[in-house]
């Protein structure tokens, strides 16, 4: 079915914003988070221990106290307000009753998850002239033992004491003045913390790093653009183009412990929309990289958009799924890409299995049997003659995480229906300055809109769609209560029926939502949290009468 868009909310929906916590319960003591707990995160749904909840990227919780029969009774329990406005894209961690939160400008907090009471705060002294593109955001922590790991806008990786917020170690990964930055939530694998760099709009050379969790010593670095003479270097027209070729890695990857493979997505080549100086496929931009997490060695890669001219990063969370396909058990990697196609790969070797459009696209006839796009014969953008293209530069989806429910067998994707008119604007590279080579403006012929789409990963078919007024930036969460939680640019926090897409509940938060929700359990009660504006809001069903 296709659900209707959410209508205007009555003023009473805002009443919860006047709710304040008057009595703060004592928080639980910080506890050791073992690697075994992280490996088996799905077995401990009371906590939220890593960016996607589990290594496979499912963002699914087996908690079901909140379900489609009672979700209409959800009510705000507490609200925490950060002092820093901006794009609040954080995924909180919850460990034994303590919530760990990051906010714009690399602020960080520990909160009592019962009440929202602040336990400690960390504020980084950032340089005045940061080069970070697209908002001074941060997407969250990783944790192991009593160490929290934070990747910062000035291109450092930091370990904090989870009990106090004190700095345990701080290492510089790159020079922020050259355009390097971190916005990614780190990922812990074994005894390493793994991060991918931002800065594709500044002509950086992208990389993925692994650091020793105890000391901060860098263990390995994988450059996402090959050095001269390395495999893939011939996909760049010159060493100079490759040296400033971008391919950042700014979204958290996923991990298969059985195969011991780390799957990390990469972003656009640089300059993002002018290919005149970088002819070729531009490896390993717009790709999924399968790396050995012990060594950083590349095991295989798959590139979605060779020679990208539209800023279509592949920095969307790769989702791992074990299922039958065409009558055979397969280990799959699912990827709804910014270019408008949904891809299914064999994650053991990177073999392309199939792809289908999941949003409007006007640049390709389809994808061939090898996984390469079959391009339409369209004119190239000029400095004065623009070319309308769908999707636009922000993509048919973007960094906002999808979720997968084993209950329904569906992948839930935030889709964006937005087209842009692209122009070229050639420019010379200057270190530390924006290096785009183009400009683009929204198409005036079609209004943008958004949707949550439920995709069958075995066929690529869209089972249902929930339409939203604007092209949204919220991720989603699915639960065993037959629910999908999401948000929209109009500030609505929404619960949908996971089987049908029917809207079951919503509340107006007062600000646009740019984050994915999480869920956790305390003292037998299930909670759901979402970031909105400068607020972190937490909801639950009414407490049982005593």
Where are these regions (language model features)?
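Blade/loop signatures of beta-propeller domains
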Residues: 33-76, 224-231, 441-442, 448-450
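Repeat-blade elements of multi-bladed beta-propeller folds
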Residues: 48-52, 87-107, 132-157, 181-202, ...
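N-terminal cofactor/phosphate-binding cores enriched in small/glycine residues
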Residues: 61-173, 479
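Extracytoplasmic beta-rich repeat domains
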Residues: 80-91, 121-142, 170-185, 202, ...
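Short loop/turn segments that connect beta-strands within beta-propeller blades
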Residues: 113-115, 161-164, 213-215, 293-295, ...
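Beta-propeller blade signature
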Residues: 206-217, 281-296, 349, 450-456
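Loop/turn-rich, solvent-exposed surfaces of beta-rich toroidal or solenoidal domains
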Residues: 444-498, 502
């Amino acid at each position: 079915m296709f659900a209707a868009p959410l209508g205007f909310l009555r003023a009473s929906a805002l009443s919860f914003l006047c709710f304040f916590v008057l009595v703060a319960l004592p928080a639980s003591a910080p506890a050791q988070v073992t690697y075994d707990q992280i490996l088996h995160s799905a077995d401990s749904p009371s906590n939220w221990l890593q960016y996607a909840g589990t290594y496979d990227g499912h963002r699914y919780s087996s908690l079901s106290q909140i379900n489609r029969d009672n979700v209409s009774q959800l009510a705000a329990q507490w609200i925490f307000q950060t002092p820093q406005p901006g794009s609040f894209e954080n995924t909180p961690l919850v460990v034994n009753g303590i919530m760990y939160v990051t906010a714009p400008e690399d602020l960080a907090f520990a909160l009592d998850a019962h009440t929202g009471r602040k336990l400690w705060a960390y504020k980084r002294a950032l340089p005045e002239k940061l080069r970070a593109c697209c908002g001074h955001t941060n997407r969250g922590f990783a944790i192991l033992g009593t160490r929290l790991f934070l990747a910062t806008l000035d291109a450092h990786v930091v370990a904090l004491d989870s009990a106090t917020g004190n700095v345990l170690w701080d290492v510089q990964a790159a020079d922020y003045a050259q355009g390097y930055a971190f916005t990614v939530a780190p990922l812990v694998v074994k005894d390493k913390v793994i991060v991918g760099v931002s800065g594709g709009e500044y002509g950086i050379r992208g990389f993925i790093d692994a650091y020793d969790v105890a000391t901060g010593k860098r263990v390995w670095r994988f450059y996402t653009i090959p050095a001269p003479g390395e495999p893939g270097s011939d996909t760049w027209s010159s060493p100079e183009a490759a040296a400033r070729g971008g391919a950042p890695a700014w979204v958290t990857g996923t991990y298969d412990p059985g195969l011991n493979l780390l799957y990390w997505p990469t972003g656009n080549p640089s300059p993002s929309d002018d290919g005149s100086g970088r002819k070729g496929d531009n490896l390993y931009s717009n790709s999924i990289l399968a790396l050995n997490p012990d060594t950083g060695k590349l095991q295989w890669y798959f590139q979605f958009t060779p020679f990208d001219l539209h800023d279509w990063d592949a920095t969307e969370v790769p989702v791992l799924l074990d299922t039958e396909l065409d009558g055979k058990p397969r280990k799959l990697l699912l990827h709804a890409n910014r270019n408008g196609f949904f891809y299914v790969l064999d994650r053991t070797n990177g073999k392309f299995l199939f792809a289908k459009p999941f949003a409007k696209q006007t640049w390709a006839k389809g994808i061939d049997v090898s996984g390469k796009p079959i391009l339409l014969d369209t004119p190239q953008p000029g400095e004065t003659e623009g070319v309308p293209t769908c999707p636009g530069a922000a993509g048919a989806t973007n960094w906002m995480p999808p979720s997968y429910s084993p209950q329904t067998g569906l992948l839930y994707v935030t889709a964006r229906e937005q087209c842009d008119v692209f122009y070229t604007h050639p420019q010379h590279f200057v270190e530390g300055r924006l290096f785009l080579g183009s400009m683009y403006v929204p198409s005036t012929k079609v209004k943008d809109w958004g949707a949550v789409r439920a995709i069958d990963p075995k066929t690529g078919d869209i089972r249902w769609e929930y339409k939203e007024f604007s092209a949204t930036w919220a991720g989603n969460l699915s639960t065993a209560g037959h629910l999908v939680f999401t948000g929209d640019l109009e500030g609505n926090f929404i619960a949908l029926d996971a089987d049908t897409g029917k809207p079951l509940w919503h509340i107006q938060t007062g600000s646009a939502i740019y984050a994915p929700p999480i869920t956790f359990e305390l003292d037998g009660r299930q909670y759901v949290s979402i970031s909105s504006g400068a607020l972190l809001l937490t909801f639950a069903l009414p407490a049982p009468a005593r």
